[in-house]
Amino acid sequence: MYITKIVIQGFKSYKDYTVIEPLSPHHNVIVGRNGSGKSNFFAAIRFVLSDAYTHLSREERQALLHEGPGATVMSAYVEVTFANADNRFPTGKSEVVLRRTIGLKKDEYSLDKKTVSKTEVINLLESAGFSRSNPYYIVPQGRVTSLTNAKDSERLELLKEVAGTQIYENRRAESNKIMDETIQKSEKIDELLQYIEERLRELEEEKNDLAVYHKKDNERRCLEYAIYSREHDEINSVLDALEQDRIAALERNDDDSGAFIQREERIERIKAEITELNHSLELLRVEKQQNDEDYTNIMKSKVALELQSSQLSRQIEFSKKDESSKLNILSELESKISEKENELSEILPKYNAIVSEADDLNKRIMLLKNQKQSLLDKQSRTSQFTTKKERDEWIRNQLLQINRNINSTKENSDYLKTEYDEMENELKAKLSRKKEIEISLESQGDRMSQLLANITSINERKENLTDKRKSLWREEAKLKSSIENVKDDLSRSEKALGTTMDRNTSNGIRAVKDIAERLKLEGYYGPLCELFKVDNRFKVAVEATAGNSLFHIVVDNDETATQILDVIYKENAGRVTFMPLNKLRPKAVTYPDASDALPLIQYLEFDPKFDAAIKQVFSKTIVCPSIETASQYARSHQLNGITLSGDRSDKKGALTAGYRDYRNSRLDAIKNVKTYQIKFSDLQESLEKCRSEIESFDQKITACLDDLQKAQLSLKQFERDHIPLKDELVTITGETTDLQESMHHKSRMLELVVLELHTLEQQANDLKSELSSEMDELDPKDVEALKSLSGQIENLSHEFDAIIKERAHIEARKTALEYELNTNLYLRRNPLKAEIGSDNRIDESELNSVKRSLLKYENKLQIIKSSSSGLEEQMQRINSEISDKRNELESLEELQHEVATRIEQDAKINERNAAKRSLLLARKKECNEKIKSLGVLPEEAFIKYVSTSSNAIVKKLHKINEALKDYGSVNKKAYEQFNNFTKQRDSLLARREELRRSQESISELTTVLDQRKDEAIERTFKQVAKSFSEIFVKLVPAGRGELVMNRRSELSQSIEQDISMDIDTPSQKSSIDNYTGISIRVSFNSKDDEQLNINQLSGGQKSLCALTLIFAIQRCDPAPFNILDECDANLDAQYRSAIAAMVKEMSKTSQFICTTFRPEMVKVADNFYGVMFNHKVSTVESISKEEAMAFVEG
């Protein structure tokens, strides 16, 4: 085992966290300047190993804490880690960590991070080989010097300490102390025995007087027993009578209470029913009032519609008469039009044929005339011109003129054709428009019907929506009335609940709910009373058990409770008690396995997540049939017992019973408040839903009104558009006729232009033909042709005139017929056709709509009448029910008053009886105590005075008491004292014998301890002396050294003799008291020269001898590790190497940690550490051998 790591923080100069690792299991050297903290490092190790700093005061602990600039250090610790591969520490671990921590108010140890006591640490170190009797495994500065300057007697004490004689001395001192105490106890026992013997002799004399006293005293006790017994029996009889009265009263009270509760529940139900009936009656009144208002409004509307229907009927009747007249006129017109159209249809073929024939004749006549004129011109030019040249010149001029006329005629023909085509297109457009107007006028009736039907449909939809909205208005009024009623009920219930608790609690509960809603706390569950349900049979028991705990607020954890409490304190909102579920730890309860003790909690219904809160309040309560049974179980099972009537016996023995006002039930009040809150919330939700529907119907009705307005505007627009169409038809009809006439005229003009063009072309051809001929007289053919042409022209002219006359006659009739039709008959017929039926359709449609509305109103009125009749019947029935229930309520309340008075009277009687019973029980207890005070009575006491009167007993008791006065000074405890003293004497004799044997055992133990101490000192001296000689030879090969035990001479105690004790010769047997000291004798130059005493040596030689003695002690009692603080400081140069070599040799089996300023120790070390000091803070770092050598040599 060895130290592997040391951690220091806050200890002396080591302020910061300092780790020294890894430490070699052999030789470790620490170097550093003076004052850097090397000694503090060793002090830290001693601090942990309890070699020093065992009992520290506050000031001493303060001195060990680091003091320097910066923050104040309030605690410090040193931690040492041991390699435990050899299991010298019996922990079963390969590594052991020991830490000691100090502060201003603490000083504690920890082993492997577990707190342990100082005694456990000391025992652990001793089990690993750290002996308290040998502190030389740690050698601090100054110890070598003190050992060097020590006297022989001090070295002897050191040897005793190493040998462990202190343990023997402690045990011997303890034995001597016990021996002294034993002697003192024996002496005291002897004194007590002497006193007891004297007292026994005195008591022997007092026993005779006591016998006479006992005889008379027994008589007295018998008489007193007779008196007390009779009084006890009388009290029991009275108590039995009172108990019977109490049981009878309780049974009567239970019956009355049960009936009272049932009647009270019935009263509450009747009140609730009356309230509900009043609510229903109020709703019926509101509905009846609404029905009356609806009836009045519908009647007003019905009267208005009836007036409108009458007006419309008259209008339709008048319209029908007017329409009949118009139909007759239309019929006559249609007849005339048909006649004229038939006549015109007969004339038109003749007219067209004769026009065609006249045109053909006219064309033929014109051609013949042109031919004739051409021949005559040709004949006249013979006389007109003298030469052919003049003629040709004239012909050419005529041709030019004719060509100009032809071109002009063609242009005129094209212009006429263009005008004709334009007129034809215009005619087609007007005819098309005329047809459209006629079709439109024909379809106006259907369109009018559609518009009227649409308006009627919209009105019906609006009326249906209005009716539904009215129903919703009625429903809204009912809901408002119900909400007001429920709000009143809720207010009354809250007031009733408020009377069951103080104002602060009531305010607090309301505030907590509001705060939880504001903060949106999901962990708020509400008061305990709202988290469970219970059967009405156990309601009283639950209230009596929970008390004010019913109003405790249940939350999920203490954080939620803290949040709410902060707001409550800030707003001063009341007082509440919280039950955080995460902090509740209800204990498991074992219930009795019996049918008359049932756990109250099993009759509660609740969410499992509230199990802890419910158990916290109700788990320790059982329901019992009577208070007596409850009391028995309360005592036997440490549970709270309760009856169904609320009588309670808790586990501490307290009883709670008596009259209870069942009308002020907290659970009922809570239930009512919760019920009305739910009703209020439901009604509010229904009201919001109803208002939302009303708003929706308002929007729909508004949309219907918009649609109706649009439909009415469409109808008006249609009516406005109807008149212009009629006017336009008349106008188009006239324009069409005029246009047809113009076209006919244009056509005639075009025919004439074409004929003229043909004539001009013919003339041009004739002139061209004449231009190519000679200028001669007409040939015979031409003359013959001229004659023939004249005759044909005359014949055709006569025929043409006849045809023209006929055509003129036909054309005049045709024109007259067309004019009659277009300007008269058609114009009169079309408006009539449009007018007939249109007004009637409008009026009839409106009349039908009015009749439908009247029918609806009739139905509504019938429904309202029926509903009002039903409502009146319901109201009468409800009024009757209310009257019956009020009568029943009055009778029940009267009976309740009587029963309550009787219960209260019974309660007062019970209270008086209870007070009387308490007095009797006190007297009974007093009698029992007096009887007990009589002690054990003789057998005759129970029968001797049974038949004796009380007066005789009192007289005898008086005589006996007078006789006993003569024995007032007798020792009444003589027998008892005699027996007690006898027992004490026997006990003291046995104790004295026990002390004698103990004294002998202690004497033997003291002798053995003295012998073992002598043997331990002699054995240790031999071992240390031998090791000293061996080690000295190794350190000083040329010399020798030895330890010499000094003892007193047997003849003279004052003369010291030096007796050399050779380790090879047997030690002389002598007492340890003859030892006076240990001296050191050495020779540094020769093994044979006379040895010198240590006082004769130089300082360096003394230090070497002291170190040799330390090494000898360490070899004799080796430790797992050794700590040397500058042990070579005072050595001469020639011995430092020897000491370093010795340390190196011993470090093979034991770890060494040394501080030094000398290079010899550094040269043989394994690990090196440097201590630095900066700003009053020490640190330790691992360094190389070269750095260590450089430091000690520099």
From Swiss-Prot:
GO terms for cellular component: chromosome; cohesin complex; condensed chromosome, centromeric region; cytosol; meiotic cohesin complex; mitotic cohesin complex; nucleus. Residues 522-634 form the SMC hinge domain. One of its GO terms (molecular function) is ATP hydrolysis activity. It is found in: Nucleus; Chromosome. Keywords: Acetylation, ATP-binding, Cell cycle, Cell division, Chromosome, Coiled coil, Mitosis, Nucleotide-binding, Nucleus. Residues 176-497, 668-908, 970-1006 form a coiled coil. ATP binds at G32, R33, N34, G35, S36, G37, K38, S39. GO terms for biological process: cell division; chromatin looping; homologous chromosome orientation in meiotic metaphase I; mitotic sister chromatid cohesion. Belongs to the SMC family. SMC3 subfamily. Cohesin complexes are composed of the psm1/smc1 and psm3/smc3 heterodimer attached via their SMC hinge domain, rad21/scc1 which link them, and psc3/scc3, which interacts with rad21. Associates with sor1. This is Structural maintenance of chromosomes protein 3.
